[in-house]
Amino acid sequence: MPRRTPSSRRGRTTALLVAAAAVAVLGAGSLFGNVLGELRPEPAPASASPRLELDAALPLGGTAVAVRRLEGAVRVDPRDAGRLGELGLAYQLRWRETGDPSFLPLSERALRRALRARPRDAAATLGLGNLALIRHDFRGALALGREARRRAPFAGRPYGVVGDALIELGRYPQAFAEFDRMTAVKPSLASYARIAYARELTGDRRGATAAMNLALDAAGGVPEPTAWAHVELAKLALGDGLVDAAARHVRAALAIFPGYVLALEQQARVDAARGRLGAAVATARRAATAVPLPQFVALLGDLLDRQGRPVAAAHERATVAAIDRVLAANGLRVDLESAVFRADHRIRPAQTVRLARRARADRPSIYGDDALGWALARAGRCAEAEPWLDRALRLGTKDSTLYFHRGYAAGCAGDRRAMRAWYRRALEQSPVFSMRWAPVARKALA
């Protein structure tokens, strides 16, 4: 039976990597997120405090109707805390569906109204914690998650929100402990996914895949959670260079949830890895059109570059910058993701270094370390870059992009032998790790 907690890995590590989220991680939203659930108070068992059941999610794609229904309900009764809390979470799901950040202020208003109506409402508190994760306000998410945990100690999700925030803040042993407790309180897709991420960050990729398969089982065939788990398994497979395995998971995701944008993103990556650039561009464009988030538009730009269409690629890069501005105007902190993107394309290097420093201060994780080191290296400040990129590798994470960044800094500093060693390591981990940088590594080793 695969291990269910990351505790046994802690002896090797002092801290753990951040998602990005995911994520894009989106996730990120929450790092393991894309798993936002409907928060609903339940009757307390005889021996327990009131608890929250957070796994009964509104079906993705069906929330427009739910939003209209809930908006009507709160117009009839403006102090219905339960309906206000559900509305706040439905707005978050609409953000996931559409990429429209204007739903996030609406979510905040609904959840705060719920708390005014019922000041100790755990569901609304945790909804605000989820919102803080989406906005990358990790210190705020930590405080709200802890408050929700105090109010509903027998619910699993508050432990997840607290753990997600702690990971982004670089407090990994504490984050692991929260994930352990979450799994003990309520084994679920959400808890197994966090265990998978913890194992991935500590270099246990086989264990990560095993835990994500448990998450897939826990999804129970429900379309969106099942598709999401398949997408995460596809990402793990691509990170190991297993293109055929990734393709199988993408097909499974799209079979159960046709048009799922996260699966379309991975389908484009699979097509590119197989040399099918035309198909990859078409699929990436479909994802970027459906949900215009930076990760999808940036992928399309990279694919267009690979196709030899620099003008079209530049247009997509400009679109990413515009989307970042809209996200920031709606309260999302995208400094880290923006810094990595700008460093990739050498956009105003000195300004990018300042952005990366600010991002790392907000998110003192190893991905924060990597973003700052990469920005410094791309700005030609190689000696400054190397210590940060070493810190980014301190957990033993098997990540080709981290290896490539370290090699680039070594080459920039004049140590071509070390550069080649790091590039070789990146390609051995996954020869398809990046459409932009894998060819650079191969050329340097030729």
Task: List each language-model region with its residue ranges.
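Register position in tetratricopeptide repeats
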Residues: 93, 100, 134, 168-169, ...
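TPR-repeat structural position
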Residues: 63, 97, 104, 138, ...
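Start-of-helix register in tetratricopeptide repeats
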Residues: 82, 89, 123, 157, ...
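Short coil turns that delineate tetratricopeptide repeat
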Residues: 78, 119, 153, 186-187, ...
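Residue-level recognition of tetratricopeptide repeat
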Residues: 89, 93-96, 130, 164, ...
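Canonical tetratricopeptide repeat
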Residues: 86, 127, 161, 194-195, ...
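N-terminal leader/linker segments that initiate helical-solenoid repeat arrays
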Residues: 4-117, 123, 143, 431-432, ...
